[in-house]
């Protein structure tokens, strides 16, 4: 048996092991940024595909001061008229949020 014939099975096994490891590694998506506009005493549409690590930019286009405040206190962004602020989503799950100044303004983030 030549050295080459002994190396072929070893090389094939190594490549197979690498492919198996790559197939089992979880895919992690790069974080995304989304914008939620506040206007006319309402939060704009909430993005549907939120993931842990994503950023939400809150933009207040209203004439009034607003906040985006999570019920679980995981974020609290205070926004003067015409200003913006951001939140990085640090956990998964359903996160209800409200405006502290206008409690009828509510929303729900679904974070995977």
Task: Show where each model-derived region lies.
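Extracytoplasmic copper-binding redox domains, predominantly the cupredoxin/blue-copper superfamily
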Residues: 2-11, 18-112
